[in-house]
C-alpha cells in the first residue's frame, strides 16, 4: 500500500511539473519602440587601461527587436573614426531605457582617442541615434582609470 502511495505521489508531482501553466507559457509582446530615440545619459568612460576602454551610455528606447547592439566608432583622428567596436545587449522589456556598454581593445597607451556612439537593432536597422564626437586618453602601462561607479 505504501509503495502505491509513493508511486501515486511521484506521478502527481511529475505530472504537475510537466503540465503547462497558461500564465507561465505566455510570452510578452515586444515593447514599443520609442518614437524618437535619444541618448539620455553619457556617453561616458567606465574603465580605461593602457590597452582597453569601456564606454557606457543610456537611451530612452526599451523596444524594437529583443537584441540591440551598442556601437562605438573610434580612432586617433577626430575626422577619421576608422575602427569599430560592437557589443550585443538583450533588452529588458520591463525597463523604459536601455544601457549600453562597449569594450574597445588593443588600444595604445597614453594615446588620445576620439569616438562616437550609436545603436542598432539586431537586423542592422539604426535606432537613429548618434552622439557627438567625444574623447578619452588611455593611461600609461600598468595604470587604470575607473570612472564608474563614481566615487565621492
Predicted segments — roles?
Residues 1-9:
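Bacterial N-terminal signal peptides that target proteins for export
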Residues 14-22:
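C-terminal segment of classical bacterial N-terminal signal peptides
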